[in-house]
């Protein structure tokens, strides 16, 4: 994998070089010391992956991510001194299109820490699988579902998701009558913080989904672990390790398919910005079961991958700009219409 490094600290750059040198399949393509240089390098010498620091002179990592995704889109992994100390900026960068975040490796530390070489390499491998994979797994159907379940809005998002989710959720009223469950591609270390972050931007309560949680009208639940979130036929949320071989955990396809297979109440599917194809087949399964489904359009997507895949296979009842998705949900849920 050809990798670009964006970091103004020589010691951090050297640490990244040494970690990447542990793998013969990784090569440092270039090093930029600020966001402006990073944008220019991405245009002139497109990498497979950018390792993006957050705090830099001139143009910081959030602004650089936004500019790169606009001019020369590529996979971006935030690598910064302390993810936990920069959570707001991490979510901003992910909202602009970054795929994940990890602490800058410190070679003197043990191998089990979040700042270890292995932690960085694991994130790079995960992104590599996402870039290469074009498959999605389905959840087998369960027994007969329970009746009387409320209206459900199932949302999937990846790169660019935090910003898109913020815009969508803040446009919903406090008395929104449906339950909302979100699967966002994010490491479990950031899930609780992201739920709290989203909660600050919406009139609806946002919390992480626990094993055994039940979706309730007017409440937003966010997938919270690196296992796959699914809905049982009785309308209870759970987590599963299977399927094991998926490029991203949690999988949007797994969740959407569980909704299609077992949710008895009315359901809506929404697939937002993201890289790859996760969610496209699950959205199609939901539409095949009579659910109204929406894919975000290209113009408003930070990364037009997942919604593009959904559009290509006819999975979306409607392809809408981000600002029209919430009004469409409000209209359809208060005045139900058939696809």
UniProtKB/Swiss-Prot annotation:
Its EC number is 3.1.1.61, 3.5.1.44. Phosphorylated by CheA. Phosphorylation of the N-terminal regulatory domain activates the methylesterase activity. Residues 2-119 form the Response regulatory domain. GO terms for biological process: chemotaxis. InterPro entries: CheB-like, CheB_C, CheY-like_superfamily, Sig_transdc_resp-reg_Me-estase, Sig_transdc_resp-reg_receiver. One of its GO terms (cellular component) is cytoplasm. It is found in: Cytoplasm. The active site is at residues 158, 185, 278. Residues 141-336 form the CheB-type methylesterase domain. It holds the Pfam family Response_reg. The modification 4-aspartylphosphate is found at residue 53. It comes from the Bacteria. CDD domains: CheB_Rec (cd16432), REC_CheB-like (cd17541). Keywords: Chemotaxis, Cytoplasm, Hydrolase, Phosphoprotein. Its main location: cytoplasm. It catalyses: [protein]-L-glutamate 5-O-methyl ester + H2O = L-glutamyl-[protein] + methanol + H(+); L-glutaminyl-[protein] + H2O = L-glutamyl-[protein] + NH4(+). GO terms for molecular function: phosphorelay response regulator activity; protein-glutamate methylesterase activity; protein-glutamine glutaminase activity. SUPFAM superfamilies: CheY-like (SSF52172), Methylesterase CheB, C-terminal domain (SSF52738). Involved in chemotaxis. Part of a chemotaxis signal transduction system that modulates chemotaxis in response to various stimuli. Catalyzes the demethylation of specific methylglutamate residues introduced into the chemoreceptors (methyl-accepting chemotaxis proteins or MCP) by CheR. Also mediates the irreversible deamidation of specific glutamine residues to glutamic acid. Belongs to the CheB family. Contains a C-terminal catalytic domain, and an N-terminal region which modulates catalytic activity. This is Protein-glutamate methylesterase/protein-glutamine glutaminase 2. The lineage of its organism: Bacteria, Pseudomonadati, Pseudomonadota, Betaproteobacteria, Burkholderiales. The gene is cheB2.
């Amino acid at each position: 994998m050809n990798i670009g490094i964006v970091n103004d600290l020589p010691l951090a750059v050297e640490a990244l070089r040494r970690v990447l040198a542990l793998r013969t399949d990784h090569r440092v393509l270039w090093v930029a010391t600020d966001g402006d240089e990073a944008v220019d390098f991405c245009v002139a010498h497109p990498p497979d992956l950018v390792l993006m620091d957050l705090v830099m002179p001139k143009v910081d990592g959030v602004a650089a991510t936004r500019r790169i995704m606009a001019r020369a889109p590529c996979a971006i992994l935030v690598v910064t001194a302390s993810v936990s100390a920069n959570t707001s900026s991490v979510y901003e960068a992910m909202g602009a299109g970054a795929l994940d975040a990890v602490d800058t490796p410190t070679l003197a530390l043990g191998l089990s820490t979040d700042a270890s070489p292995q932690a960085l390499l694991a994130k790079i491998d995960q992104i590599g699988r996402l870039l290469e994979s074009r498959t999605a797994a389905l959840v087998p159907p369960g027994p007969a579902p329970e009746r009387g379940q409320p209206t459900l809005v199932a949302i999937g998002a990846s790169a660019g998701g935090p910003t898109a989710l913020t815009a969508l959720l803040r446009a919903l009223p406090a008395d929104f009558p449906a339950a909302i469950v979100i699967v966002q591609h994010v490491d479990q270390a950031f899930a609780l913080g992201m739920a709290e972050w989203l909660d600050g931007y919406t009139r609806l309560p946002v919390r992480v989904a626990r094993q055994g949680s039940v979706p309730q009208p007017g409440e937003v639940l966010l997938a919270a672990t690196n296992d796959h979130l699914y809905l049982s036929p009785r309308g209870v949320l759970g987590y599963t390790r299977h399927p094991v071989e998926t490029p991203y955990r949690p999988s949007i396809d797994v969740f959407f398919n569980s909704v299609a297979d077992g949710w008895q109440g009315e359901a809506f599917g929404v697939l937002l910005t993201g890289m790859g194809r996760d969610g496209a087949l699950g959205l199609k399964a939901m539409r095949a079961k009579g659910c109204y489904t929406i894919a975000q359009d290209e113009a408003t997507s930070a990364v037009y991958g997942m919604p593009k895949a959904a559009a290509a296979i006819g999975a979306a009842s409607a392809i809408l700009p981000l600002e029209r998705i919430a009004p469409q949900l409000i209209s359809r849920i208060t005045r139900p219409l058939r696809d």
